[in-house]
Amino acid sequence: MESTAKLSFARLSPRKTRLVVDMVRGKGIQNALNTLRFSPQPSAKLVSKLLSSAVANAEQKGVADVDRLYVKTIYVDGGTVLKRFVPRAMGRASKIRKPTSHICVVLAEKK
C-alpha cells in the first residue's frame, strides 16, 4: 500500500531542494529522517516534515507495519517564480527572482 504527501509553493529553490531529495530517495523512513536531521540545508527541515506527514497518512490508511515503509519516489518540481524589483542608482531597477518548489513523496512497504 502506498501513501503520498505533497508540499506546494515552498519558498525554496528547486535546484537546491533536489540535492536534499536525492539523499533520501530509496531509503527507509528512519534512515531518511536521520539523514535529514543532520543535513545543514534549509530545505532538509521541510522535507523531513513532509516525510513525517506521509508516515502519518500511511498510519491513517491502516498500513500494517510503519517500520517497513521506504521512500519509493520523491521529486521536486519548480513552482511559480515571485518577481520583485529593487531600486538602483540613476532611476534603474534590478529584478529579484524568488523561486518556489512543489515536493511530492510516495512511501511504500518493503516486501
Swiss-Prot record:
Paired cysteines (S-S): none
GO biological process: translation
Gene Ontology cellular component annotations, sorted alphabetically: cytosolic large ribosomal subunit
CDD domains assigned to the protein according to its UniProt record, in alphabetical order: Ribosomal_L22
The organism's place on the tree of life at top rank: Bacteria
Assembly and binders: Part of the 50S ribosomal subunit.
NCBIfam families named in the record: rplV_bact
Functional description taken from the UniProt entry: This protein binds specifically to 23S rRNA; its binding is stimulated by other ribosomal proteins, e.g. L4, L17, and L20. It is important during the early stages of 50S assembly. It makes multiple contacts with different domains of the 23S rRNA in the assembled 50S subunit and ribosome.
Family classification: Belongs to the universal ribosomal protein uL22 family.
Protein name: Large ribosomal subunit protein uL22
